[in-house]
């Protein structure tokens, strides 16, 4: 789900299939490995020159993409939504509800430079997303799981949090850095036999996927949960609804799922548990909200 877009954990792979058991057989000696590591370290140092911090959590991020580039892509993607998706009429109850919640969240986002807009798409899919620049899209299939206005705020504030933290730009920056490291490693390995290069690049690909890409995707989702919880509390919605929403969402999606370390998203139960731990802080924020409304209007 846009409730569904690297540090967290590492990958342990117990199989040695496809990997050399003898360093000389693979044709990779200690010097080549050290050169490769030095190349990757150099790319990492260059990347740090583009660091920024995520809002609320303060996590340091690699950011090489100008935000205006992200916003331009978001604006184009939002125009495509209007062309390609069946929208719910703007005067319908669902559209008015999504618009109202969106206005409240936008009002506490501290991004008055965004051109905030909302759309409701007629679809049974349980999905929502926010595009750079403040374009929020909600599929009406998720509304029954929301149950009430605060549940909808959980979904929408989570998606807005991805944009405020510029997770899309961070992922593009990380991919750019990984591509640069791969090029550097390929250069170091250029004089090795093809089989040695293939083995090394396969291992590199697995390491970056399971040790960098997937853990950071989960990190982004958890961070969006954290930021979103504080946003909904600022906007006047009871943050206690957040773990309840994820419990309902898990119950509504009981099909077989991949193990968490193979997934881009944390397990739903873990999300609910993590949000419970953040509730005391979020409730303090909620008590200072200008216009607290609790769970708001019932949806079902």
Predicted features and spans:
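A Zn2+-metalloprotease active-site environment signal
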Residues: 2-300
């Amino acid at each position: 789900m846009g409730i569904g877009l690297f540090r967290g954990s590492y990958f342990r792979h117990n199989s040695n299939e496809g990997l050399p058991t003898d360093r000389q057989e693979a044709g990779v000696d200690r010097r080549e490995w050290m050169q490769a590591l030095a190349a990757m370290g150099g790319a990492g140092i260059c990347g740090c020159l583009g660091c920024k911090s995520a809002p609320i959590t303060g996590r340091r991020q690699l950011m090489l993409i100008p935000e205006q580039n992200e916003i331009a892509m978001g604006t184009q993607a939002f125009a495509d939504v209007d062309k390609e998706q069946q929208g719910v009429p703007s005067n319908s109850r669902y559209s008015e509800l999504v618009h109202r919640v969106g206005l409240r969240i936008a009002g506490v986002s501290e991004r008055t430079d965004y051109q905030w807009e909302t759309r409701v798409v007629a679809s049974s899919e349980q999905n929502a997303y926010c595009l750079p620049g403040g374009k929020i899209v909600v599929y009406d299939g998720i509304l029954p799981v929301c149950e009430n206005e605060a549940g909808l705020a959980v979904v929408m504030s989570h998606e807005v949090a991805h944009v405020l933290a510029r997770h899309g730009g961070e992922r593009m920056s990380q991919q750019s850095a990984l591509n640069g490291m791969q090029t550097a490693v390929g250069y170091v390995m250029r004089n090795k036999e093809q089989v040695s290069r293939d083995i090394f690049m396969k291992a590199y690909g697995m390491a970056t996927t399971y040790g960098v890409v997937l853990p950071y995707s989960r990190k982004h989702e958890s961070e969006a949960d954290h930021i979103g919880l504080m946003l909904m509390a600022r906007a006047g919605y009871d943050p206690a609804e957040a773990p309840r929403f994820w419990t309902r969402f898990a119950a509504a999606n009981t099909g077989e799922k991949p193990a968490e370390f193979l997934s881009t998203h944390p397990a739903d139960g873990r999300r609910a548990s993590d949000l419970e731990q953040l509730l005391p802080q979020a409730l303090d924020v909620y008590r200072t909200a200008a216009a607290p409304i609790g769970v708001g209007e019932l949806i079902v």
